[in-house]
Swiss-Prot record:
Keywords: ATP-binding, Carbohydrate metabolism, Glycogen biosynthesis, Glycogen metabolism, Kinase, Nucleotide-binding, Transferase. Catalyzes the ATP-dependent phosphorylation of maltose to maltose 1-phosphate. Is involved in a branched alpha-glucan biosynthetic pathway from trehalose, together with TreS, GlgE and GlgB. It catalyses: D-maltose + ATP = alpha-maltose 1-phosphate + ADP + H(+). This is Maltokinase.
Length: 452
């Protein structure tokens, strides 16, 4: 067997778009687990070490001596070892179908004390003959689409513990909730004691949402239509999004209801320490927050004695995490807030966390085009149209949520505003680091929320 340890991991990993160590100096990368799936295919877990003492573990499926699809040959080629070339197997013509067959047969593969378990969901049908291609979407994982039947998400940066995306999709699918793509199968590396808490989730297969449109694309198209019709109100424009926002509110409420029914609810204190810690760390990096910090802190502190109902939620909900099929809205990617520890991503929270995420996303959809045009501070008419669009869709979403659940988010206005503020503070930190030109969007919202 060719030794994957001989491949140039330290050179190849930083070139991948799912690599999470860009702000750290990589000091070394080598395989810690190697499990042969067949003679020319290895499952490899690579440990990447950084100068700050941190470590990430990445999953790479290595196919040997099999040329990848030509258009991907550069990104897929890892390197040579023992006169053979190793490729990222997900870009191979045939390897993804083989991986799907392992899930279909609930196969087990083991080597050197490591055991990889593949599992199919009850009554699931996997498209074993379908053609596969890698999605070109920017992701922290890699998704392989099998015709219009299934999507295979391979986790790249992996960790032990119960994966919330698998967990919640399984719960919602088995409960028959219509607003998720059904889970078809999974695979994982068994933990030391064989329990789910110590296992290493590695990937999942769900139904593919055929003929679906992303919520973000639909919303921004609606905004462009509104901007193009300067003499019409939002409800008069052909691309009005309010009806879809209402239905999205219904879908989110339905998902929340199923999660509450199956996994339960409890009472907890408002997470004042967490939001204050985020505010403090972000304000230290974003000087523009300074003038608002005291007011935000005061708003959070007022909720310190508040008892809230918490349950499992999506955790990172926005318009890029929802798909509109011909039948309904689907919620996808239940992994929680990126970069947070697993235990925090699985922690119960208020459903208002998800509501606030969608409301914040409306702001981005409306004001994003102004930022891209550089006119957010100069074109007062377009800014007013953007505000009109935001308010119309906020109202529609909350109306839909209230109609489906019997709970109106606006009845908890101070708590909802606090979750919106917390999200906007997070956005300010993100934009300051990655897209300074977009910083005015969260700052505008923070100014509005603190003035209310």
């Amino acid at each position: 067997m060719t030794e994957p340890a001989k491949l140039p991991w330290s050179d190849w990993l930083p070139q991948q778009r799912w690599y999470a160590g860009r702000n750290r100096r990589l000091t070394g990368a080598e395989p810690s687990v190697i499990v042969g799936l067949r003679d020319d295919l290895d499952l490899v877990l690579v440990d990447a070490d950084y100068a700050d003492g941190s470590r990430d573990r990445y999953q790479v499926l290595v196919c040997w001596d099999a040329a990848p699809v030509s258009e991907y040959s550069t990104v897929a080629t890892i390197g040579a070892a023992d006169d053979r070339t190793g490729f990222d197997a997900l870009y191979d013509d045939e390897a993804p179908q083989f991986l799907l067959s392992l899930i279909d047969s609930s196969a087990v593969r083991s080597a050197s004390g490591a055991e990889v378990r593949f599992a199919k969901e009850p009554d699931a049908q996997l498209p074993l003959e379908a053609m596969a291609h890698v999605s070109d979407a920017e992701q922290s994982n890699t998704s392989v689409i099998f015709d219009r039947d299934a999507i295979f998400k391979v986790f790249r940066r992996v960790s032990s513990g119960i994966n919330p995306d698998i967990e919640l999709n399984r719960v919602l699918g088995r409960a028959g909730n219509p607003h998720v793509a059904r889970l078809l199968g999974t695979y994982e590396m068994a933990g030391a004691d064989g329990t789910p808490e110590t296992a290493w989730p590695l990937g999942m297969v769900t139904e593919f949402a055929a003929n679906a449109a992303e919520g973000w694309a639909m919303a921004t198209a609606s905004v462009r239509d509104l901007f193009a019709e300067g003499d019409l109100y939002a409800h008069e424009v052909g691309g009005d999004f309010a009806g879809e926002s209402y239905r999205l509110g219904e879908a989110v409420a339905s998902v929340h209801a199923t999660l509450a029914e199956t996994l339960g609810t409890s009472q907890a204190a408002f997470p004042v320490d967490n939001v204050l810690a985020r505010l403090s760390s972000t304000a230290a990096l974003v000087p523009e927050l300074t003038e608002y910090a005291a007011t935000i802190e005061e708003r959070f502190a007022k909720l310190a004695t508040e008892t809230i109902t918490v349950q499992r939620v999506h955790g990172d909900l926005h318009l890029g995490q929802v798909l509109r099929t011909p039948e309904s809205w689907l919620l996808i990617d239940f992994e929680g807030e990126p970069g947070q520890p697993l235990e925090e991503r699985r922690a119960p929270d208020s459903p208002l966390r998800d509501v606030a995420g969608v409301l914040r996303s409306f702001e981005y959809a409306a004001y994003g085009p102004l930022v891209e045009q550089g006119s957010q501070n100069t074109d007062k008419q377009l800014a007013a149209r953007a505000r009109e669009w935001v308010e119309r869709n906020r109202t529609a979403f909350c109306d839909g949520y209230a109609a489906a659940s019997g709970i109106d988010p606006r009845d908890s206005a101070p708590l909802l505003a606090a979750y919106e503020l917390d999200k906007a503070v997070y956005e300010a930190g993100y934009e300051a680091r990655h897209r300074p030109g977009w910083l005015p969007i969260p700052l505008r919202s923070i100014a509005r929320l603190t003035a209310a």
